[in-house]
């Protein structure tokens, strides 16, 4: 069972001028935006730094001075890319990282300048911040969340400065941002988009799916989901998807390092698992039973509870003082948080039970 690192060992010494860009390259560059390069990559197109140089500089920094990564495998990938003739010479530029709690925005992107004269715009998925997670949940009732608008602005600004063709991509929320930005970009920009890679990213509201830009890009959208996908089936999708085999189980299949690779392609599975299909039906049934206002109230109540203490990340939630603060807030319940959450969770349980009865003899 080969993975991304096996792919780099096999194909890493062959430049893209000899072996064309493929979906596995798209996933690798999508993951790259999870690395917090901080000031190593310029915020504009003046003086791009090579991927190899950026990686070497980043990895040479003392542990306490390195920017964050999503997981240790991201650093391992960065080290492998620095040694690869296929990736090391590529330019990095136009880095943007915006975290604005008061706007409930978590957004980051980086441009990778490919050796064929095109660029790959990589959008970061959700990080560990509660702000980022709340923004994701808000996609269930907003036609556009702040990060989606930021992604569109990013693509438009980059395209105004860069004359070549474009590829867009991301993992998880990053894949959603790539599709959103491509679909709503001006037609002169859309015409330059060669492909968009959505790696297990959530879907959209009908406003986006019915837009002329989305419909126009359908043949250029490449959506990949693992067998037990949950995130990649959220909300609505009109584009076809490819089901990828993973070495993990359940929700852990969202990890792109678990996806199986063969040559320059992913190893395909025939279909998603029954568990994935049932989870999708339960969530969609639950959301269908809630008005946009009810969804908004549920999300606000949930994250008000989670942030009752000093928690700002998912890891903070497990600290005793933050758990105690959340429990006190739930017990106090002056603002009706407990009732809102209880009603929402009861409806979710009913939806899940209905799906179970329909699918399990």
Predicted regions mapped to residue ranges:
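Gly/Ala-rich beta-loop-alpha elbow adjacent to hydrolase catalytic centers
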Residues: 169-174, 178
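Short glycine-enriched nucleophile-adjacent loop
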Residues: 178-187
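Alpha/beta hydrolase fold serine-hydrolase catalytic domain that processes acyl esters and thioesters
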Residues: 1-24, 29-110, 114-119, 123-138, ...
């Amino acid at each position: 069972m080969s993975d991304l690192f096996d792919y780099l060992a096999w194909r890493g010494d062959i430049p893209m001028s000899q072996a064309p860009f493929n979906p596995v390259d798209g996933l690798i560059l999508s993951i790259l935006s999870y690395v917090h390069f901080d000031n190593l990559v310029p915020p504009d197109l003046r003086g791009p730094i090579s991927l190899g140089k950026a990686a070497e500089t980043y990895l040479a920094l003392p542990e306490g001075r390195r920017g964050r990564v999503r997981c240790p495998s991201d650093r391992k990938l960065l080290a492998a890319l620095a040694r690869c003739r296929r990736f090391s010479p590529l330019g990095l530029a136009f880095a943007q990282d915006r975290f604005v709690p008061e706007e409930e925005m978590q957004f980051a992107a980086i441009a990778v300048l490919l050796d064929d004269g095109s660029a790959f715009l990589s959008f970061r998925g959700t990080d560990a911040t509660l702000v980022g997670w709340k923004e994701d949940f808000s996609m269930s009732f907003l036609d556009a969340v702040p990060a989606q608008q930021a992604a569109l602005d990013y693509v438009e600004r980059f395209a105004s400065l860069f004359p070549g063709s474009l590829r867009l991509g991301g993992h998880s929320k990053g894949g959603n941002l790539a599709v959103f930005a491509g679909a709503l970009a001006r037609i002169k920009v859309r015409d330059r988009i060669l492909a968009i890679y959505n790696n297990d990213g959530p879907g959209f509201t009908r406003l986006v799916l019915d837009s002329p830009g989305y419909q126009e890009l359908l043949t250029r959208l490449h959506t990949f989901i693992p067998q037990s996908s949950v995130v990649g089936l959220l909300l609505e999708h009109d584009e076809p998807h490819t089901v990828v085999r993973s070495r993990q189980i359940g929700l852990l299949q969202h990890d792109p390092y678990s996806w199986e690779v063969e040559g320059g392609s992913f190893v395909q599975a025939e279909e998603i698992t029954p568990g994935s299909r049932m989870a999708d039906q339960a969530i969609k049934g639950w959301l269908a039973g809630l008005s946009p206002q009810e969804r908004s109230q549920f999300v606000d109540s949930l994250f008000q509870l989670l942030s009752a203490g000093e928690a700002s990340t998912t890891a903070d939630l497990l600290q005793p003082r933050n758990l105690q603060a959340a429990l006190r807030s739930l017990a106090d319940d002056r603002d009706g948080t407990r009732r809102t959450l209880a009603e929402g969770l009861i409806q979710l349980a009913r939806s899940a039970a209905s799906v179970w009865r329909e699918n399990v003899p």
